[in-house]
Amino acid sequence: MPGTCGGTTSRCPYILWITRGENVTYVTPLPRCVTEMAQWGSVAGDKVPSCALGGLRHNVHVSGELIDTTEMYLRTIFELEEEGTVPLRARIAERLGQSGPTVSQTVARMERDGLVIVSGDRHLELTDAGRAYATSVMRKHRLAECLLVNVIGLPWEDVHVEACRWEHVMSEAVERRIWELLDQPTTSPYGNPIPGLAELGAAVDESMSAAPALSAVVGRLDASPIRVLIRRIDEPLQTEHDVMAALRRAGATPGSTVKVSRSPGGLLVGSGGEYAEVSLGVADHIAVEPV
């Protein structure tokens, strides 16, 4: 599990550059304590947090930021199930922007590791171990979102992407402390249930409550404006920075009642003087309740 150290570097093909200050000191295989659970990919951009290595702390630089590929895939399958979408390798490729062969190789490794099963019709099923792992990752992700919004004050539209980093490095002790610190939240800032809270001692109903998509509600009505209560924002929409910022400025956040009317570009959504124009595709990922 993450956070355990003292593993050896044997049989690890991953290389990282160890630095002290700004100078490269030496090159070493990535220690097993970092790769125990899954293989790691990289995304160009940021500096990786310091890592315990050989009893010392160093700044670890790869060509970018370490991302746990297995955890990304597990969380994506979990998301698809929440949304009622059949988990297929093609859907994972779309969500993560990866090639078909890359996804197939990763899924094959996950199947070998006992995390998923590829059924006869090619949809992916989480094993008991895979579901427990995916639930843990999503729980950490949504608790990180709560902390980033309620304590750190990160802008709403930036929170999801940042939480995608935190989910891979948060220990169980830290997630438990965050949950207690925030008065035991049960939903994320986007209205999605935090799964697996029973493992932290909660006695709550973690099921996703049924709520139609905004696009479906509007599609059944005439051209007259309607009022709806926003219940939640689906995970795929949370990556759309500009759309999320526009929704926030318009007051169209979970728990808010907004007015919705048709527009040439799709729909106008807002709770006051400012409105956000969203496409019907975006409205597919906004769960609402007519009022």
What kind of feature is each model-predicted range?
Residues 107-108:
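Short, hydrophobic-biased segments on the C-terminal half of alpha helices
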